Amino acid sequence: TPTPPTKPTVTEFKQAGYNSPKGTVSANLATATSDGAKYTYQYEGKTLDITLPNIKAGTVVSSTDGSGLTTVVGGSTYSYSRFGAVFSANHESPSEVFSVGVPTSNMPTTGSAQYKGLLLGDGMTSDRQAFHTQFDVSFANKTLTGTGNTVDGTKVYEFRDGKIAGNAFAGVFAHPAAETAGTFAGQFFGPNAAELGGYAHAED
């Protein structure tokens, strides 16, 4: 049995240099058309190829083009999705985080599942941070909840009241530094909801 590849680490995300000006981060979902298709993301009128099929498991790739646009991509350990961030060197354009994948077409309707991965984010006190995440999903009840934890296991973020509709989901995102709760949304990717990805936002 092959050894499962390691996931990208918090340190690797920091080294990739993700940092965006406070208050300008937006978040979006994009999709790949089919299993094995090219993963692309639209940013400021540009189509970015974030497929990166030859990157090694457990790594995060950061690349900057001639215009100073930097793209940070993780998800090399996943078969049906990618996630990351894109920002300009001079911060003239808004920074964005993204989740891209092959949407699930055969959603489970019974049972439950637990997903573990990473959250990449930016905030007033947590520029270019990544956290470990865990989501508990009930396909029978069409609900999900989750947490975002530091390396030592301290809970920092909470995803609650998540509702599943088709292959998509949405709910309440709670951040201790935010004045009010925000929102999170996402999709399941791959056959039988093999993976999930999405974004969250809360105002400081």
Each language-model region and where it sits:
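Mature soluble binding/inhibitory domains
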Residues: T1-D204
